[in-house]
């Protein structure tokens, strides 16, 4: 995956086809904490009675993952990276209404193969 506006290649793989890692800069992390809030919890409770997808939580989860990913990419750029490999996501419940979403990977400099 490439983020042209950030000029950073991003992948869950250890390598990027067509590129060689020329320098490993270190681990980069992006974190966000989201609160479901009273309204979200109420809507989820009502939807859980009838079953099905809880769209409010899906949207919140997608936004949180993207924000964590963007923050991780920003950290990589601060180190001078032009790629991040081995990206992973993790999440933790901090309390009944707050979740922590983490994106992490290895910031690297890559060069395009000739």
From Swiss-Prot:
Q: Which domain of life is it from?
A: Archaea
Pfam families registered for this protein in UniProt = YbjQ_1 (PF01906)
Q: Which InterPro entries match?
A: UPF0145_dom_sf (IPR035439), UPF0145_YbjQ-like (IPR002765)
Give the signal sequence positions: none
The similarity annotation says: Belongs to the UPF0145 family.
Name of this chain's protein: UPF0145 protein YG5714_0873
């Amino acid at each position: 995956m490439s983020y042209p506006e950030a000029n950073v290649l991003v992948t869950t793989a250890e390598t990027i086809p067509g590129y060689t890692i020329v320098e490993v800069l270190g681990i980069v992390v992006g974190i966000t904490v989201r609160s479901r809030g009273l309204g979200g919890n109420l809507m989820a409770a009502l939807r859980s009675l009838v079953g099905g997808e809880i769209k409010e939580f899906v949207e919140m989860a997608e936004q949180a993952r993207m924000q964590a990913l963007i923050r991780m990419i920003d950290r990589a750029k601060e180190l001078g990276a032009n790629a991040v490999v081995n990206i992973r996501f993790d999440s933790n419940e901090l309390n009944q209404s707050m979740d922590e979403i983490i994106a992490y990977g290895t910031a690297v400099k890559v060069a395009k193969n000739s």
